[in-house]
């Protein structure tokens, strides 16, 4: 422990002297109030400290005390359903302890509840050899999540004691005799520094799709479990709703939602909606699998920088248990702005648009902690982290540094489009500019699993949309009637794909989520109509006759998005109905 004195205060940056024994990334207690800060730069005996609380009223001469430890999170039972701030202070218990709706400065509250007792069930017995990552036992944390208590990193040896029963997170639950003869006494809780990724046995190639229930994503721009995706878009384009939808319905075990520098009412929406929503996979409340980290725009700027790392470290902990985890960061642009502010106060040479020169490497550090891995331990386990980051470029300009550095790393780009949002087409993901580099892997995975030609259907549907885009300019110049019959059919089918398939209402109880079998049935109906109508045109039928003769069945195709999942056969039955009606048009003499 080293004690120094403050010499300057500049917003969230405090410079202290007499800190020659301190290290970079040490946590400090700053001033008489004991504010939490982290050393980010050392020059001789002077330490530059990033303070995670409001610094008004702090002045030169006040003491700074280092703890000798890096910024770390507590990992153990009690994380799920909890809401933390950027440095893992539990907001619910913080409010009760301080009796205030605001963050009172200098208050230290343990991240995990020290009084709560958890029922521990051992999975191993005394005398067994264990290595780091082995599961010693389990705690039923919520109705959905079984918390697996693991041997901490760098601990291995013989299990000499393990106890069943109800324990707090600090009680000794097991003892391991290590190779050097020392006894390691372990509890249900462990700590981990947030800026250091948790080690794994092996990184694997992600192939299994993350099913979100959003048709435009799952069909055209899928992300895998263990992949990384970015959602850039201008104000009002629907970034937050896309993030909320994925958090609600993604087929993962655990969701970490990081509200980083965005409006507080967005976190309020999460708190109001999530407890009422039922997870379609488990039948339990979605809150039973969710961890919330709130660092909203009215909270200290410096803590935004920590909140992203706090979230990804908690995600890695659950991944190591063998779970699939999705982490949403809304928004990484606000996090980058916090980096820019600290860089400016440190008087570093600025890069593009004032962001620090190391912006790209910091963004990469975050996204590269996602992935599909084989975890440590003698038991074979796989875990995944899917990282989805919203980016808020000013004015929707994706050429700015945060978006460009993000796109260098992630493999999925869901580009939100202001014109689509203004036309009330949601999700406003532009199908012409967005992309997914997982498309081929996911397509072949689904073809193999479902025994279907899904990837072929997706390619055909995208070709229709691209053909429509090339025809639109001709239509604007000389009108729709000047097109050939086949091209008019392309325009009609593309409109069906856009309005009846891609457009989705997040606030409709049925349309908000579409399972994969329903997506396939809906897309098959539209493509069948295109195929049969194209054949009819080649046999001499007229476009207008086909459209009039199939008006009823096309209306039913359009309404199929509102048919509940349990009535899936109704949607599948429309395929034959389409063929029958077009054949009827031909039989009537449309030649």
UniProtKB/Swiss-Prot annotation:
One Pfam entry name: ATP-synt_ab_N
TM annotation in the entry: none
Keyword Nucleotide-binding: yes
UniProt entry tagged with the keyword ATP-binding: yes
Enzyme class: translocase
Sample GO molecular function, one term: ATP binding
Entry EC number(s): 7.1.2.2
Binding site for ATP: 233-240
Record InterPro entries: ATP-synt_VA_C, ATP-synth_a_Xtn, ATP_synth_asu-like_sf, ATPase_a/bsu_AS, ATPase_F1/V1/A1_a/bsu_N, ATPase_F1/V1/A1_a/bsu_N_sf, ATPase_F1/V1/A1_a/bsu_nucl-bd, ATPase_F1/V1_b/a_C
Keywords noted in UniProt: ATP synthesis, ATP-binding, Hydrogen ion transport, Ion transport, Nucleotide-binding, Translocase, Transport
Its biological purpose: Produces ATP from ADP in the presence of a proton gradient across the membrane. The V-type alpha chain is a catalytic subunit.
Name of the protein: V-type ATP synthase alpha chain
Organism per entry: Streptococcus pyogenes serotype M49 (strain NZ131)
């Amino acid at each position: 422990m080293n004690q120094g004195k403050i010499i300057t205060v500049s917003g969230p940056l405090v410079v202290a002297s007499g800190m020659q024994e301190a290290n970079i990334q040490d946590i400090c207690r700053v001033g008489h109030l004991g504010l939490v800060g982290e050393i980010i730069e050392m020059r001789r005996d002077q330490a530059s400290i990033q303070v995670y609380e409001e610094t008004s009223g702090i002045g030169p001469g006040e003491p700074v005390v280092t703890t000798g430890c890096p910024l770390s999170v507590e990992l153990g039972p009690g994380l799920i359903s909890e809401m933390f701030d950027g440095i893992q202070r539990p907001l619910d218990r913080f409010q009760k302890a301080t009796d205030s709706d605001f963050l009172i400065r200098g208050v230290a509250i343990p991240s995990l509840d020290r009084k709560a007792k958890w029922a521990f069930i051992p999975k191993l017995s005394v005398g067994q050899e264990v290595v780091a990552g082995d599961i010693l036992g389990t705690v039923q944390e919520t109705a959905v999540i079984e918390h697996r208590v693991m041997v901490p990193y760098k601990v291995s040896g013989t299990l000499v004691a393990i106890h069943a029963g109800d324990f707090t997170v600090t009680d000794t639950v097991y003892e391991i005799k290590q190779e050097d003869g020392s006894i390691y006494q372990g509890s249900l809780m462990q700590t981990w520094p947030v800026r250091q990724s948790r080690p794994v046995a092996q990184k694997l190639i992600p192939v299994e799709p993350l099913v979100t229930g959003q048709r435009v994503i799952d069909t055209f721009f899928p992300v895998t479990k263990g992949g990384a995706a970015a959602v850039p878009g201008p104000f009002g384009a629907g970034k937050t709703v896309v993030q909320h939808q994925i958090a609600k319905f993604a087929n993962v075990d655990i969701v970490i939602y990081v509200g980083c520098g965005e409006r507080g009412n967005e976190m309020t929406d999460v708190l109001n909606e999530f407890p009422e929503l039922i997870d379609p996979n488990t039948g339990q409340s979605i809150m039973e699998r969710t961890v919330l980290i709130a660092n909203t725009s009215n909270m200290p700027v410096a803590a935004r920088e920590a909140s992203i790392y706090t979230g990804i470290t908690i995600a890695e902990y659950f991944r190591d248990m063998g779970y699939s985890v999705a982490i949403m960061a809304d928004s990484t642009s606000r996090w980058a702005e916090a980096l820019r502010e600290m860089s400016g106060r440190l008087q570093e040479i600025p890069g593009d648009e004032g962001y620090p020169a190391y912006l790209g490497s910091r963004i990469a550090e975050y996204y590269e902690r996602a992935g599909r891995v084989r975890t440590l331990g003698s038991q074979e386990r796989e875990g995944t982290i899917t990282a989805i980051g919203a980016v808020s470029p000013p004015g929707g300009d994706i050429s700015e540094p945060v978006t460009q550095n993000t796109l260098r790393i992630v493999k999925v780009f869901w580009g939100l489009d202001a014109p689509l949002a203004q036309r009330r087409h949601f999700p406003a993901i532009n199908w012409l500019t967005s992309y997914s580099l997982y498309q081929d892997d996911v397509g072949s995975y689904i073809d193999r699993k479902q025994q279907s030609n899904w990837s072929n259907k997706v390619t055909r549907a995208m070709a229709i949309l691209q053909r429509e885009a090339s025809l639109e300019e001709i239509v604007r110049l000389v009108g729709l009637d000047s097109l050939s019959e086949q091209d008019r059919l392309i325009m009609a089918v593309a409109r069906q794909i856009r309005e009846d398939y891609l457009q989705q209402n997040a606030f409709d109880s049925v349309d908000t989520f579409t399972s994969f079998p329903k997506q396939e049935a809906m897309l098959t109906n539209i493509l069948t109509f295109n195929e049969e109508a194209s054949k009819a045109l080649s046999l001499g039928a007229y476009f207008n006759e086909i459209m009039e003769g199939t008006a009823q069945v096309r209306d039913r195709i359009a309404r199929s998005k509102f048919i509940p999942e349990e009535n899936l056969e109704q949607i599948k039955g429309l395929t034959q109905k389409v063929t029958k009606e077009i054949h009827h048009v031909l039989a009537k003499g449309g030649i």
